[in-house]
Amino acid sequence: MAAAQETSLRADERLVLEWHGDNRNGQTTDDHYGLALQRLTLTGSSGALRTSAQIDGELFWDAPTADYEDAGRLERVAVEYDMPLRGGDLTVTTGDFHRQLGRGLVLSLRRVDEVGQDVTLQGGQLAWSGDTLDVDVFAGRTNAAEFDAVSQHAVNDPHDVVAGGAATLRQLTPLQLSLGVFGMHMRPRESLVPAYGQDHMSALGASLEGAAPSGIAAFYVEADWQGRHVAGDGTMAKALYGTLDLNLGALAVQIEGLWLDDFFVRGSRNSAVGTAFDYAQPPTLERIDQEVIDNTNTRGGRVRLSYALLDGDLVPYANLMMRQNDPGEDTQLDQIHAYGGAEWSYDGGRARLNLSAGARDEVQDGQTFKAMKHAEGDWLSPIGGGHALHISATHEERRLESKAYRRGSSVAGLEKGGLGAVSVEVGYDTSDPSDEVRRLFVAGILAWEPTDAITLRSTVGSQRGGLKCVAGVCRDFPEFSGARLEIVGRGDLL
């Protein structure tokens, strides 16, 4: 008698209630309105079958413009099924799924919650995995989350057609090499000049990855080619990317290089922001939070040195990044960013102190275009009874051409394991000296976990906005002034 298949069903519910007052950013189109956001995510499995669905909705009251739209929809749905095939495992996927080729230069459809980005491919994928060979093919249309969390405006689905595939040969001796090849073809729904016919682009790439058996070294190299046909004109583009990691006892060395020759993948227009969707997210060489305005025509490198002391509890490090945007052109921009710091873990790993500081310069035509000096700190220290103090701070001294300003934020809080935290956040931004624009921001934050299945987080006050970047994805966030309550519930239904 066959064994019963294990079946599960899980629900995750997120409800956000907001009231926006006057954030004093010099605009009136984002003030004095309320908002309720809801997201229900269901995930289930039964034997080799896995399913998921996401239901989203937004409800506004006193909306200042028609751009804030009430809506409700089935945002995501996916079905996966595993089966044995020819000595390997075949996974069949239909519906919505994220997909990346290589390190994201050729294609990167992914979710970046911190900047409100979520694009999937709505279609199908066949993926076969054997002992030393992985192969997959996929096709579908791009499906963007229909609510832009930054502007809080509706997003029209781009429905750009994408098809591609990849193959990876693994465990090639003696360095446990992996050789990968991949490619994709994209046809955007919107052409730049429809009279010249359908825009389209194709890209091919290859990668080689390996590591020494001793663990002393590991590397990754990727080369890509792209052909674009836009408004009747054909363009060829190329890209190279590589990393080398060395573990020399207590010393660790990371080396990274990037060359992009007019390399990008753009689809139809994002109706919420007015620019095209980016379907590729190449590495940037930058620290994850750094502003990256252009990452399509650039070359550069980065090196990071770290040294483990006190049995690895104290790790000082130094990082140097140099890149050129638009090399050899009149608009060439030379960028250099040097920073260093230390990460210290003590009290048996229960406490930590991280400090860093650095400087950045961007020079164009012999003149400093942008400059920044920055410092960051994060301290967590237990104080007994399951309580801990947590303080984090960032500060930036900036100059944009002849304009000097500063911005930063600090958060100080008391945390209780298994219960929650209470914090105060203070931010500042002097980039706009206008009297009607707020420069000091103060907010109180309360997080509470009444049960293992429920988490509440409330924010009251004002919070700094501005340009925020995560791994090269950048958005300009509006300042916030008002109140916000987030309730998250989770539980197993089966």
Residue positions per predicted region:
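Cleavable N-terminal export/targeting peptides
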Residues: 1-6, 492-494
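Conserved C-terminal beta-signal and adjacent last beta-strands/turns
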Residues: 409-427, 439-461, 485-488
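"Short basic amphipathic alpha-helical interaction patches in structured regions
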Residues: 107-112
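Well-ordered mid-protein domain cores that form the structural environment of catalytic cofactors
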Residues: 90-104, 120-122
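Outer-membrane beta-barrel "beta-signal"
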Residues: 280-281, 448, 462, 477-494
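Signature for the C-terminal beta-barrel architecture of outer-membrane proteins
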Residues: 4-36, 43-74, 81-90, 114-408, ...
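Bulky hydrophobic/aromatic packing residues
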Residues: 70, 102, 255, 448, ...
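Short loop/helix-cap segments at secondary-structure boundaries that form the rim of catalytic
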Residues: 104-105, 305
